């Protein structure tokens, strides 16, 4: 706008355009509408970018205000033209020359070019040295380097001597080119150019074309002269010209304030006094030595400041400032040592007090009297009054107010898909010092010259506001440049000052204050909102200060007011004319200069006449007209995805045609799908041409679907590929909670495997008999055998249990249970089939079946009824034995009949002994017996195993406790029992176990870590003493008919049947997937059995484990590697039907398994200390083996998979070898005789090494012998694994599938977490690849990202999983037979079970007691107390030996916890015997949390680790809230909200389970991981397709045959190879089942990656010149270079017209790297736990690491972007990396070491660097034909050092570490803004301090703060040595 008011105005005529008075209504131009989208002009681009465009186009002189932009322009120009200088110098290659004025500037330029490009740079600064060089020497230099940076003198010498001719230079850069006007080498160099035919491109850089005052004519002349000398056009940057043509110019007003009339004479008097005092000090004749400080300095300063305030603001302010200065002086006086200095200070102090006294005579300082202020101040207040907002504008206001700070805040998240970034509470509380939300219409700055003026003026305005209601709306503050300067050294005091200033700016930005009084520092560099009022209180003295203060008035309607005293006004008018002239000159030079006047003169065009609008629907539809089109285009560009540094804008070029008309060409940013430039028709003027082309553009954008039907940009949500998502409709349920979240839980029936449904045998129908084989494979190690008990291997006795059913049971893997004797391996083998039984037999069997569950195991309870015919799962469990001396097992009918007859079967037999018929002791009766004391507990008698017969004790022996003399006396006194036989021996007994959950070892927690135990000595002493044993008298006990050996096996039944159930369910799922997805076979070959189920960790190690290797002559060598502590060739003992072990010539029925370990011939015994870490099942001793071993490069044994060594591998027999040879670490192939496998190569097609755990990988421990034949004496029913099978062809091991179905809450030995993480990353990869490659060629990254997150969302996966029927199959709660076990043949009795239905809310993770630990503990105590009355102290009561020893506190703590949190509504009676009273009610507190538990006072000493299951850090929660919750199995966990008041679900524990939606989604991912590890990537993709996630293209049946995917061929051919006719049949069935109507093809690589473009190839060559060096560096050559270019092209790089920008490749690469790294970590032989995996993955897959690696491998030198901010951030980051030169972990401690610890500044990590690291991975993937291997070959070498460093020492994010360390007392503040636009976060660790962190986003700042807190906490911790 032309300034309407340049003439001085008297106040009456002062017409300010204030927002309130503006015709557009009061809400136009609100300051918080920050980044307004321009409607009438294209969004301006950064001035550096404009200048670069100009420089590329012609010779240019760049005039900038500061040095900052110069390097950017020079370096980018060099890079853009670098294709001209890469050639060989001797073959017409050119060179780029930088000229600088002085030697010290050379280094600076060199480092800039080296940092940002890979060009070779030569530096020449010393004229003396280089003057002596010969032409040859120079020639070498020119050949070696491509960019030459030299001082002007060196250059002149080189050119003059003809060593280098100008025609060999492609670009000549002059730094500080204004010097060329003088007589300077620059000028001479330019003279040489005059005669040169092909002159180089010239770039002149100058920042000092304007210095101080300057005459416009001179300036113009200077610029013209410079242009002439340098043959260039001068271009100025917009920072020298106010906002060029883009924004409306402010209205400029000069106000004549009139003279000051001093009626009271006070002003004159004060002025005189001050002058005198100043003169006096100046006259003092004090000699000042140069070293010393001037004593008068402070005094002079203070007095002259005071005088200035008086003159500018008047007496009232002078009085105020005098008061402030007195306070300031006091401080100085107190600290001043030197007498003379002190005297001056005291003099000044007195003088200021005098001033104050004078003022007090005239006015009271308390209130403001306007008679005593200058006219300037009065005018200022008048202006401010005009901005007073109107009252009561109610419309919209509050919303406006609330939304106001949207734009002033940083974009919080670094990128769109960072879901984890916390939402920030953005609404700041408005300060209370202004009355209404409308106050903020003013947004103004008053510029003053001196610091004190600012301070006092602020005081004055505040005072005026109190007195004048018109000014009450003002909320002002001042800011002085003190301490803001970037590079000043800062001390504590400055720091505080700095903080204060920052706070002031923050408030101004947030519009909490609306007026800022500032010194000139705010003119430049500080981030301030657009103001609508700028007042120059002191007139600008030079052009720069005029422009910069004016530049602050950027709001659409703004005023720039200059206040002038009458006497100054004349001279200022002159100045102002000068400034205007200078501005005009510079504006003509501005690279976008268009005459600004045009805007006002041009009327609003009636667009329809000129050019018809684009209308969607004729009547009322949205329309784009000529006048609105540009706004639409700007808005569209602003919505394209981009990083925080780049604001994408359209580029419009307008050219004049010969006939005087104009046409425009519009280019959109390169990541818009509309790639072609749009050319508009010729129009009469420039403005119209620009508008018309925008209109055409809108039409095109709408037609390709980029603008929606309201003509607004299409968001990523309204994707036009919705059909791709085919999201199913959300099922209608009444279940509260968001679908897919943890909060939403639903009930599902528990699955029952088909083969066990209704399979109860019927008379006369054929039956199947299965034997439950049990072999003790790992005896309990001594240090865990506290009572020194004898171990009872189950295979020592022949009688065992079997299963009788009417349907066949598929083969399932063997699995372990953990008894008191150690690990027992269970097998289910078919004994006979097709036989029938009579009704009597079946009735007997049925009665015994019920007897086992009701009496032996006591699992019958009122809620359960035995109804074998109605039960869902019904089959019989019955005893088997060797019948009639034959060696085969059969049903033991005789035994069953004996039991029926026995008196002791149910109750206690009433035997009477008397003196006449005394009790006779027979030893053999007690050798394998269970006994029942006959004198107590008649309703539920206790049962004991006889552990030992003490023949040396009799009832007359001494009783262990002093109260009784002898045992006989004790029984007489206590029970009144007389013994008839006084020399019978006594019995040492053990409880029969009531722990029925034997799935995991007693002494390990679920992660396989040993629980803490009390010291062995203590324990040993305890068990040695008689006091702690239970001693019974045989005469007083009855013998139970069930022998102890069988009883011990019966105790295992619930666990065995439960595991059997689960594995069959998993097997069923495997078969179902085989038919749905075509992965694996529907039914397994009969002779195949999967490897054993295993936990991946193993028992704490036996101190004397032996690693024995069988002698090579041993008949049996079916060795397998099993995850056991003992690496043994477990000779065929374990494959036998009844696990018989034909060892050499032994023929006995049962060989004690231990003989295998210690007596095999030729054994190698290695003592192994207990400190073993089970790696992959091959235990190694840390002292023997330094390092970790990578066995055959794969963890092949996850899951106890018997790894059969197939015959394809020849192994040399060797008998002994040092243990180091067991492992092969660095993957070097060993000599062939020590066969180890190399990964990734399939061996002969059949023996597949799997990609990772889950399938038998054939790997042999060197030294095991391998003969392929089955040993001759193996019976037919034993299985020999046949060579053709592997999980790859048959489908995953059911054990692994079970792992994928088991949640961590089930507290089993395995859970789905590791698999889930692998599946999660593969899923992301699969979805990404398909969305990019096959289907969507033109969607940009934001949309792709949105689609991906929709598909992989928990909500979607949950629906798919539910459709697939997973919830019923999942294992969600801990197995606890008394609580949730349903024995076979039982049904839940609906009437009685109501008492048992648990309200879901009360359900504590399916009840902790379930652990089977607590009830035991209680039961034990109760009993022992009875029997061992002689104990001295009750505290010693110790529970059953397999229970850990908890001291009373633990138990009390747990009680408190359970009772306090009302853990169970249904009380499980603490003694499992009183099965009747199962309905106590414990009520539940509303919300159980740590706070509300009534802990015992000694809670602090409670050792968490020992109660592993009870209190645990629950990582699953951390994901969601970033907070760790110490989870007590508290009810609110399992519920959908007691607190939320939603309905509770009640459900039956035996037949139903309650699962959170998210767990189902996790399970889907884990199953995917399971298929991926077992059957490979193709299988995993097919599995996803079968779920309904289309990750492969569908082929119609017809063309199926032609396009069979090679991988599918493999599947099928492998099927064909199955040996034998059966296999062929199953192969055929397989094909039939697979080839349904759908076939899936393979993903194709998208056909094009370059756009059709006439010059495409040439452009490509130019753009990637020099990239061959990069290809060498990463060791990969691109076949299609366009991918390479695309990977490095940033969205701002508009010179690339032939490919897309890197965003889509980055989206792909991100998923690929995430998957490859996760897979690598998953397969690490160290078998990281889920928590560690998560930490490692987030430490390695993050932007910081990727960016650091990108810089390390020079990615940044090839990066193509045109973005000044990004340029500087990368520059900083690279410098920082060079200094640090050491990569760090998580968040990589990227901070500059600042001495002042006050705030921690995290260095900015440029996201773009991490992005190109990812995009290159995507490019290699595409270029190599979608080969993940290729990508990993390139990336693994780069990442390996980090992977190894972190795996050895897992980093955690500082925020998480802090929250884990101090979860209760850590509080993070919301974000605050700092003065330069960054974010500050404060973390308070209550009681330990507050710590601040600063960064560009909330997340960075938060982690910086957390890191400082951690450093401080760790420093103050007492150092505890790591135990």
Curated annotation (Swiss-Prot):
Double-stranded RNA (dsRNA) endoribonuclease playing a central role in short dsRNA-mediated post-transcriptional gene silencing. Cleaves naturally occurring long dsRNAs and short hairpin pre-microRNAs (miRNA) into fragments of twenty-one to twenty-three nucleotides with 3' overhang of two nucleotides, producing respectively short interfering RNAs (siRNA) and mature microRNAs. SiRNAs and miRNAs serve as guide to direct the RNA-induced silencing complex (RISC) to complementary RNAs to degrade them or prevent their translation. Residues 1853-1915 form the DRBM domain. This is Endoribonuclease Dicer. Residues 256-595 are annotated as: Required for interaction with PRKRA and TARBP2. Mg(2+) 2 binds at residues 1706, 1811, 1814. Residues 1276-1404, 1667-1825 form the RNase III domain. It is found in: Cytoplasm. InterPro entries: DEAD/DEAH_box_helicase_dom (IPR011545), Dicer_dimer_sf (IPR038248), Dicer_dimerisation_dom (IPR005034), DICER_DSRM (IPR044441), Dicer_PBD (IPR048513), Dicer_platform (IPR048512), dsRBD_dom (IPR014720), Helicase_ATP-bd (IPR014001). Residues 51-227 form the Helicase ATP-binding domain. The modification Phosphoserine is found at residues 413, 415, 1015, 1160, 1461, 1469, 1471, 1869. GO terms for cellular component: cytoplasm; nucleus; perinuclear region of cytoplasm; RISC complex; RISC-loading complex. ATP binds at residues 64-71. The keyword Calcium does not apply. It comes from Bos taurus (Bovine). It comes from the Eukaryota. Binds 2 magnesium or manganese ions per subunit. Residues 414-425 have a biased composition (Acidic residues). Residues 1246-1255, 1277-1290 have a biased composition (Polar residues). The lineage of its organism: Eukaryota, Metazoa, Chordata, Craniata, Vertebrata. Belongs to the helicase family. Dicer subfamily. Residues 433-602 form the Helicase C-terminal domain. Mg(2+) 1 binds at residues 1316, 1396, 1399. Residues 410-433, 1246-1291 are annotated as: Disordered. A motif (DECH box) lies at residues 175-178. Pfam families: DEAD, Dicer_dimer, Dicer_dsRBD, Dicer_PBD, Dicer_platform, Helicase_C, PAZ, Ribonuclease_3. Its cofactor is Mg(2+); Mn(2+).
